[in-house]
């Protein structure tokens, strides 16, 4: 069962600059890929399957941010396309505006590169960031979404894969039994 936990972040100036860079790069890659898909379809009447990696040669500053954030922007665009073709009333994907002051990006947990302690969260390419953790959770972190609201406050939403309580308790008991045998 997937459950999300939202916490307040307290990044320093350097981390705030990195987040601003990530927000901008995610918006840029989404808009650029959408524009290229539209142009390619108008010329050839075929779908274009492009990836963020193809743009890193042309725009080297994209290498400065988390590659999984860019990959998630690609997945969001693909989801918007699929929704449009399945249900046209949803509408064609729209370009992301700079004027929208709700910024966010999502990154995935790969090999434990994201973890949460009592006072900090570790994120890829940026390291430890102070967090106000008011609730604990058990389970495996799937992804995190960093967001900034219009007032400038930062938040992190941690998506956790939690097992059902019965399965979790049973598994925990099995682990304790195995540890006691050793």
What annotation goes with each model-predicted range?
Residues 1-182:
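Nucleic-acid substrate recognition interfaces
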């Amino acid at each position: 069962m997937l459950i999300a936990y939202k916490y307040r972040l307290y990044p320093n100036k350097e981390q705030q600059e990195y987040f601003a860079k990530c927000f901008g790069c995610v918006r840029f890659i989404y808009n650029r890929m959408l524009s290229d898909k539209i142009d390619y379809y108008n010329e050839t009447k075929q779908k274009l399957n492009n990836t963020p990696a193809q743009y890193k040669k042309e725009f080297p500053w994209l290498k400065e941010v988390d590659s999984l954030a860019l990959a998630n922007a690609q997945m969001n665009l693909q989801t918007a396309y699929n929704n449009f073709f399945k249900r046209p009333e949803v509408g064609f994907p729209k370009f992301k505006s700079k004027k929208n002051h709700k910024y966010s990006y999502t990154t995935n947990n790969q090999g434990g590169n994201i973890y949460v302690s009592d006072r900090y969260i570790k994120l890829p390419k940026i390291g430890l960031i102070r967090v106000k953790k008011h609730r604990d959770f058990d389970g495996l972190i799937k992804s995190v979404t960093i967001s900034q609201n219009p007032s400038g406050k930062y938040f992190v939403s941690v998506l956790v894969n939690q097992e059902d309580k019965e399965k979790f308790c049973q598994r925990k008991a099995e682990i304790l039994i195995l540890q006691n045998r050793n």
